[in-house]
């Protein structure tokens, strides 16, 4: 979990995608997140976290539905939503925190 603290402690916004390999909604978010990362460039980061490989972290953050997306800035969670999201909405949200 100390690695998680390092992961989210950036001044640029960090979009975390908690996903499952077998979850269809998670799979459909892959191209969306690729578009978000491309649009952000160095103004933000997109990080995918597999809940099956990170069960302790998933439990600590109470991840119940997939995908679950979170935006962190400066070590603080500033936004959280479960379910599929649109790339334009995510880009606009992240730009609000740049």
What residues fall within each predicted segment?
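Structural motif corresponding to alpha-helix initiation and N-cap regions
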Residues: 1, 51-54, 87
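Local sequence-structure signature of Cys/Sec-based thiol-disulfide redox active-site neighborhoods
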Residues: 3-36
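Short hydrophobic/charged patches on amphipathic alpha-helices used for structural packing
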Residues: 4-5, 55-58
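Thiol-based oxidoreductase modules, predominantly thioredoxin-like and allied folds used
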Residues: 18-20, 34-37, 41-56
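Chalcogenol-based redox active-site neighborhoods
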Residues: 28, 60-61, 92
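Structural micro-motif
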Residues: 61-70
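Non-catalytic, surface beta->alpha helical segment in thiol-disulfide oxidoreductase systems
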Residues: 73-98
């Amino acid at each position: 979990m100390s690695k998680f603290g390092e992961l989210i402690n950036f001044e640029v916004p960090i979009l975390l995608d908690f996903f499952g390999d077998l979850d269809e909604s998670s799979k459909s978010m892959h191209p969306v997140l690729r578009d978000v990362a491309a649009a952000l460039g160095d103004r933000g980061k997109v990080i995918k976290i597999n809940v099956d490989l990170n069960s302790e972290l998933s439990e600590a953050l109470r991840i119940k539905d997939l995908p679950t997306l979170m935006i962190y800035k400066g070590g603080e969670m500033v936004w959280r939503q479960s379910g599929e999201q649109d790339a334009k909405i995510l880009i606009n949200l992240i730009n609000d925190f740049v």
